[in-house]
């Protein structure tokens, strides 16, 4: 089982989480590297770094479990290079499109779930047998936390899923 990219991204996320919460001030770290209005003032690195910042231990654990579960399937299918391109480029596009929401809200977007949603969308497109289940999963993950009062970037999940689905539909990486 060669999951070179998936395992590397998981390791990087946990290393950054450790730095964020145990080495640096987590609030300042999150603001500096999360995606927020500072992006419009020149903090352009945020579009990349926000994919590696997480709001809590449960946030990173849930993201990394889902990344491992679906990343292991797609990395085997695509190979690590194409999988890496899908994850990173899909995450960047999701971040850029999510910037539109920042115009209306003062928020700080953090987490890997936008890029992970790209993977789910891609998989839903190429795997017609599991398509309905994956759509249900993304809807639950996007909206159930809101019903419990948990702040979730539901739009990033839906945007990412759509980007991934389109990438699969147009056979961008095959």
What does each model-found stretch correspond to?
Residues 1-174:
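A detector for small-residue-rich transmembrane helices and their helix-helix packing motifs
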């Amino acid at each position: 089982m060669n999951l070179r990219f998936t395992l590397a991204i998981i390791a990087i996320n946990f290393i950054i989480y450790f730095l964020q919460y145990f080495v640096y001030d987590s609030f300042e770290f999150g603001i500096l590297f999360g995606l927020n209005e500072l992006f419009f003032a020149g903090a352009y690195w945020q579009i990349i770094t926000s994919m590696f910042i997480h709001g809590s231990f449960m946030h990173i654990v849930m993201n990394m479990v889902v990344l491992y579960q679906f990343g292991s399937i797609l990395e085997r299918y695509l190979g690590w290079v194409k999988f890496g391109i899908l994850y990173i480029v899909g995450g960047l596009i999701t971040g850029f499109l999510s910037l539109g929401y920042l115009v209306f809200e003062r928020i700080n977007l953090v987490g890997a779930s936008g890029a992970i949603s790209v993977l789910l969308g891609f998989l839903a497109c190429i795997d017609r047998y599991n398509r309905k289940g994956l759509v249900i999963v993304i809807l639950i993950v996007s909206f159930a936390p809101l019903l419990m009062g948990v702040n979730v970037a539901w739009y990033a999940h839906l945007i990412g899923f759509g980007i991934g689905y389109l990438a699969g539909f147009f056979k961008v990486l095959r």
